Amino acid sequence: MSVFTKGIYDRLYNDPILRSKINTYNSEPAIFTVEPVPGNARLPYVVVSGPISDVPFDTKTSLGREQTVDIRCYTENHGSKQEVEEIAERVRELFHRQSITITGYKNIITSCTGPVFIPEDEALGMVVTVRFINEKEGI
């Protein structure tokens, strides 16, 4: 797992409110950083994508990266969107305008768009898109 993915995972993993809203997998919170999600994983769970964009954010005196990551939230479709909305809103609260720890980098900006619904056949899904600007330390 990259230092960027680890920073995101750690923020999600260490939040007791989020943990209370999602299932477990192998005795750990059901937060996945690989796809596809294991077939025996039970909803609700959260999936952290790899970067959907990753571009330089360099200056004359610094090296940086601007990355965009999707964090998808899934629940069973019981006819109500409340559960998936609560999980997705919590994910947004954990990242929007919050600084996260990334080994070797200083997190300059974190902002979110969404959550928005994503079409799924068997489950309800919402995605929070998170934009990070990180500056490499020690340059």
Question: In which residue ranges do the predicted regions lie?
Answer:
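Mid-chain, well-packed structural core segment of small domains
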Residues: C73-E93
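Short histidine-centered beta-strand/loop micro-motifs
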Residues: F57-S62, E83-E85
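Oligomerization/assembly interface segments of phage tail-like spikes and tubes
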Residues: S62-H78, L124-E135
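Small/polar-rich, solvent-exposed N-terminal microdomains that initiate assembly or binding
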Residues: M1-T59, Q98
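Acidic-leaning, charged glycine-interspersed low-complexity segments
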Residues: S20-K21, Y25, R92-I139
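Residue-level signal for secondary-structure boundary sites
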Residues: P56, G79, K136-G138
